[in-house]
Amino acid sequence: ISNVPTTGSPKALVVLVEFLDTKFSEYVGDAKSFYTDLLNKPNYSNEYGASGSAFDFYKASSNGLYTPEFDVYGPVTVSQQESFYAGTSGQANVALMVYEVVKKIDKEVDFSQYDTDGDGEVDNMYIFYAGKGQADTGTSGLIWPHNAWVSLSGYNIEKDGVVIDRYACSSELNGKKGTPLGVGTFVHEFGHVLGIPDLYDTEAQFTSGYTVGKWDTMCNGSYNNEQNTPPLYSSYERYALGWIEPTVLDPSETKKETLNPLADENKAFLVPVPQKDSEYFLLENRQQKGWDEYLPGHGMIVWHIDENKDAWMKNAVNNALSNPAGHKCIDIMKADGMATRDTEDGDAFPGTGNINHGSFLSWANKKIFNMTDISEDGDLLAFTVGDGSTGISSISVNDAKEGPVYSLDGTRIADNAKNLPKGIYINGGKKIVVR
């Protein structure tokens, strides 16, 4: 939820920051030139495995509608060692760091040009800080890449008639390899600037919930291929940002459809939930090529969306504990019924389990539509959608397999099939009926 422009070529502010004890490495050479190219150069590549620049990513994700210009300043050196700004939380004094950075670049920057929506505030100041970060090292004393507001720490910064409040930051180096990172974390954090939320459980330290994993850049996908190849924004993100107008399907009519890869055609289907304008399903075709090369699988991804404003505003759309909706608001319907990190390759249809049908329920537990005959011919998906067959082609009477049991929306509900109430579940990758 944001008023920042998501079309055209708006300017964005980026600053390179060094600490008393950490400077940019020899890998990046001239840091300003390196980051100017990493963010802006068309058809970019480098020796560290980059699949493109941030410009390339946004141009591809938006089908050419959004081509931002990133102005890079610095490097500037702040007054303390990195551990001081990181503190015990990984971001304890980063607001102070932002305050110092603004003072250091004030003479060469007209901050007013970075208020692209005219609300009196700089849209965002993005900081690349020298060295490694805490997220991919687990090392205390390093800053955790994040998105925040300095006003939450008591700072009021105003220059050139505009307020500098919101910022985001990420590290220079890969925590494992020690080489420069690609644009994965950058396009994730900048996604927040555009108005899209995290899709992981932001309270994951208190839960064990799996959401959409490597399938999405706003979840763990930002780390795909060492952050060099984040997956393109999904049909849901494109829809939210005004980059796609999905084709609406009426589930009361049985129809055969085909779908080319989202990366090639920028096309998706939307299945509405009756009497619920904020709830719907999105169908997209994802194939492992280009920016999507490092997805965990390929085929049809079915998104179940609930545009719950409170959950979006709190950045809690998929939280297990604090989500105002009481359920995941932006989730993938797992084809194999297993919502785990180890089974991500089975999330798509037909997927590794060759699951060619599915029945999809609203959050009120009402059947909305069925899909059958889901198949892939090269990159092309074909399927039949309607409200007819349940997709259960035959019934056999057997005991359920040992192992966890999932609801039809992919939520793990039991360690085994014993003592379950009546209903239809997923166990061992198959539907089971408890009577």
Predicted regions and their residues:
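Active-site-proximal segment of zinc-dependent metalloprotease catalytic domains
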Residues: 1-211, 215-226, 237, 312, ...
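A short beta-strand micro-motif
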Residues: 15, 271-273, 404-406
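Short, ordered coil/turn segments that flank beta-strands lining enzyme active or ligand-binding pockets
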Residues: 118, 189, 276, 408-410, ...
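Residue-level detector of short, conserved catalytic/binding motifs and their immediate flanks
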Residues: 10-15, 123-125, 182-183, 216, ...
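C-terminal outer-membrane/trafficking sorting elements
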Residues: 390-435
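Low-complexity, Pro/Thr/Ser/Gly/Ala-rich linker/spacer regions in secreted
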Residues: 1-5, 384-399
